[in-house]
Amino acid sequence: MKKKFQLEVPGGADKVLLHTCCAPCSSAIIECMMQHHITPVIYYCNPNIYPQEEYIIRKEECTRYAQSLGLEIIDADYDHENWRCHIIGMEQEPERGGRCLRCFKLRLLETARYAHEHGFSVITTTLASSRWKSLEQINEAGQYATASYADVTYWEQNWRKGGLSERRIAIIKEYNFYNQQYCGCEFSMRKEE
């Protein structure tokens, strides 16, 4: 993949804690970061994923990709029940609604906490690569998450541009990644009526 745009990491950091939702969404982002001499440390924090078997499959694919590139992957605890407690009353919200925003805030707040405790100055997320998610909500959640930690900055980056979407498709084929058909939670599995 050629460098199609310049990445400007806040503070010029060369190491970033990358909240990762799945291997397909993270693949081109990780490759792009590495080509720009940025080392991503993959943070797999996805208590929203249902069922747990799905969580494990996605985690294993992230691990396989990280290991193939010699990158560190950190697995946050899977606590789906705690996640459910945080979204009570929002179960019927549509995709891109309030439930998604609350979910993003929860996951990115945990990412920011980990970054603060382990010396990372910058976090970003692969959620910003999905055309199915609101970039505005993701950035709001990232800013919310880092507001409590003066030493951690959220890196707003539109990972849908610069040829990354096309490269993502190629990497999925190259690695034969499992490519799920829903965001992750049981509520995103609902069929459109």
Predicted ranges, named:
Residues M1-E193:
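Nucleotide-activated chemistry modules centered on ATP-dependent adenylation/adenylyltransferase
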